[in-house]
Amino acid sequence: MTRRRGYVQTEAMAPLRLGISACLLGQAVRYDGGHKRDPFLAETLGRFVEWVPVCPEVELGLGIPREPIRLEGDPAAPRLVAVKSRRDLTRAMARLARARAEQLARLDLVGYVLKADSPSCGMERVRVHRDRGPARRRGTGLFARTLMERLPLLPVEEEGRLRDDALRASFIERVFAYARWKGAVAAGMTRPRLAAFHAAHEALLRAHDPGACRRLGALVANAGKRSLRAAVADYGAGFVAALRTQVVPTRRRAPGPPAPPAARRSPTARPAASRPAPRRPRSSP
């Protein structure tokens, strides 16, 4: 373990532990007995992280294969319903999600990748069906909603969004930053260490959200006026929120033609305006 300006940092980090929808690793747990293996997650990122696979529908005992399920009703509080049998699974999934989220909270996760469009795991824009009219893409999977409510600081993304280079880079950056924050807190946070952590991440914060960087700096400066626990909790929430803001690359103007060199002037020459005007010849009387 090393110390930089009071900031505790490990020499070699253990593999980062992330939760993931099990089907994305190739596990045949989908309703049709298939999977949605994602090569980047399973092969590329998988070499550097420890995955914790979860399939809430299988853990609920729905079996493989199983009857399709979907969200219905109010997007803010949808019901989870089996399509053919019309079995209402809302309460059962809510109980499972709460229990599973508590288990995951004890596993020291630093990120989570969810399956897009899933009625249980979708992070956003999940179809919510209604009695009349087309389905609306305004829902969140029941398990995903509970997970994000229980672990609000946890970096969470969907595999579909991770195909975008900028979103992928942002997620990985947030995962590593959150891991550093959790490590700093676990090592024992003090006011000097909080100040050192902020100093080490100030440039990163400023690139994402200059306003948040200033607010966090003020929070650190005034940390002695309040309880350390409250200061650490508020800083952690602000730190994670600031990194969710996308960095907008600065557009550089194309270089124009070089300016012409300034005319060299003799050191003895005087400005034309300072030269005396020539005398006019006097006329004869």
Specify the residue positions occupied by each region the protein language model found.
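Short, positively charged and aromatic/hydrophobic N-terminal segments
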Residues: 7-9
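Short, hydrophobic/glycine-enriched beta-strand segments
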Residues: 17-24
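Short N-terminal binding/cap micro-motifs at the start of the first secondary-structure element
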Residues: 25-33
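Short catalytic helix/loop segments, enriched in acidic residues and glycine
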Residues: 34-52
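N-terminal beta-loop-helix "entrance" segment that forms/cooperates
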Residues: 59-74
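Divalent-metal-activated hydrolytic enzyme cores
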Residues: 77, 81-99, 103, 135-210
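Short Gly/Thr/Asp-enriched flexible loops that form oxyanion-binding sites at enzyme active sites
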Residues: 117-147
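Helix-loop elements that line ligand-binding/catalytic pockets
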Residues: 182-256
